């Protein structure tokens, strides 16, 4: 799958050719996770609506939920003003975090809201 050249031209990738992907749950608006995408992962996500990312540690693409069953159906993808981050709005099935938690931001609160 090839990324549309008009979209590719707008992306500002890091030195490894990746863009940051912020993943937000459609219903709750919670931020679920942050991941990386290369052009091919973004193209596949746009084509299939299955959240597809790039694993820096494994050096390959992965489809969220392919092995765990904890899938992300992508409703929308937005590019930020700088072109270096995409925002995916998803329906999450199961936990988004590799720990099994609903969100990767469920564990450690560094600053609690004021009352």
Swiss-Prot record:
Recorded superkingdom: Bacteria
One Pfam match: PRA-CH
Cofactor: binding comment: Binds 1 Mg(2+) ion per subunit.
Subcellular compartments: Cytoplasm
Record-stated family: Belongs to the PRA-CH family.
UniProt function note: Catalyzes the hydrolysis of the adenine ring of phosphoribosyl-AMP.
Protein name: Phosphoribosyl-AMP cyclohydrolase
Organism: Mycobacterium avium (strain 104)
């Amino acid at each position: 799958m090839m990324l549309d050249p008009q979209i590719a031209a707008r992306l500002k990738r890091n030195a490894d050719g990746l863009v940051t992907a912020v993943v937000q749950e459609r219903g709750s608006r919670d931020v679920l996770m942050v991941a990386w995408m290369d052009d091919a992962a973004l193209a596949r996500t746009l084509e299939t609506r299955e959240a597809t990312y790039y694993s820096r540690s494994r050096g390959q693409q992965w489809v969220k939920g392919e092995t765990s069953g904890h899938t992300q159906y992508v409703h929308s993808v937005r590019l930020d003003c700088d072109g270096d981050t995409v925002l995916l709005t998803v329906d999450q099935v199961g936990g988004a975090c590799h720990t099994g938690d609903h969100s990767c931001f469920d564990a450690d609160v560094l600053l609690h809201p004021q009352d």
